[in-house]
From Swiss-Prot:
<keyword id="KW-0689">Ribosomal protein</keyword>
<dbReference type="InterPro" id="IPR001787">
    <property type="entry name" value="Ribosomal_bL21"/>
</dbReference>
<dbReference type="GO" id="GO:0003735">
    <property type="term" value="F:structural constituent of ribosome"/>
</dbReference>
<comment type="subunit">
    <text>Part of the 50S ribosomal subunit. Contacts protein L20.</text>
</comment>
<keyword id="KW-0687">Ribonucleoprotein</keyword>
<comment type="similarity">
    <text>Belongs to the bacterial ribosomal protein bL21 family.</text>
</comment>
<keyword id="KW-0699">rRNA-binding</keyword>
<dbReference type="InterPro" id="IPR036164">
    <property type="entry name" value="bL21-like_sf"/>
</dbReference>
<dbReference type="GO" id="GO:0005737">
    <property type="term" value="C:cytoplasm"/>
</dbReference>
<dbReference type="InterPro" id="IPR028909">
    <property type="entry name" value="bL21-like"/>
</dbReference>
<dbReference type="GO" id="GO:1990904">
    <property type="term" value="C:ribonucleoprotein complex"/>
</dbReference>
<dbReference type="Pfam" id="PF00829">
    <property type="entry name" value="Ribosomal_L21p"/>
</dbReference>
<comment type="function">
    <text>This protein binds to 23S rRNA in the presence of protein L20.</text>
</comment>
<dbReference type="GO" id="GO:0019843">
    <property type="term" value="F:rRNA binding"/>
</dbReference>
<dbReference type="InterPro" id="IPR018258">
    <property type="entry name" value="Ribosomal_bL21_CS"/>
</dbReference>
<dbReference type="GO" id="GO:0005840">
    <property type="term" value="C:ribosome"/>
</dbReference>
<keyword id="KW-0694">RNA-binding</keyword>
Amino acid sequence: MEPYAVIQTGNKQYQVRKGDVIDVELLDGISEENKEVLFQDVLFTFDGEKASVGAPTVGNAVVKGELVSFVRGEKVVAYKYKKRKNYHKKIGHRQNYLRVKISDLVM
């Protein structure tokens, strides 16, 4: 079986393998010049034969990635309405994300 890891970023958890492309919430310190992304909150690793479960994180495990692009999510529409008062309000929101390609799993 192929090695994989479970990482936590932006209060969400992702199962990643080398070569995967994931969309994560914006991270501090990431720009077009600084394209390397390090995920140090690794909750679980599997190297093909042995699994390591963190308490709460696996000690020296790091997942490395590189920035592919800045993307925006789907539009979420919220609609406020009050009956018989001729009041309605439509609000839209699009979340900004980083598209990251996983380059290495260091276990």
